[in-house]
């Protein structure tokens, strides 16, 4: 007995059966993003513009404050506690596990992530550790390439930070 099933029906069944699997690729990414965001950390952000000019800035997030170093080297306290950070990750649209790598000697899983956060659309790569932390990210936004490196072991707020707004 031969059953003739239209290819479109097979494709539809495949899409329905694999959609939950594809959607679950974002679960570990979102979990690591939230976990990393709610853990004190230091960030080194390197921006490379379309002409190849690099700008390196730093951020320190403690339990009760966020410190940002501007391109001129000055530090500012932003009065943003970890509990005040936005947990809305609905803009993380698609995620795909693309391999494994290491960051600073720590094994990671690499994900390719398509994001639309507050109108900023980007494609990023995230390196997620077995401790459920984002250790590195790379992406392009409006023609500039960004590399962000996270450090959860060395979190010391700058002594010379001025309150944002000059108060």
Q: What does each model-identified segment do?
A:
Residues 31-32, 58-60, 150-152, 156:
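Extended lipid/amphipathic-ligand handling interfaces
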Residues 1-52, 103-107, 159-167:
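N-terminal leader/targeting segments and the immediate start of mature chains
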Residues 107-166:
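Gly/Pro-enriched, hydrophobic low-complexity segments
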Residues 61-63, 98-109:
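Short, ordered beta-strand-loop transition motifs
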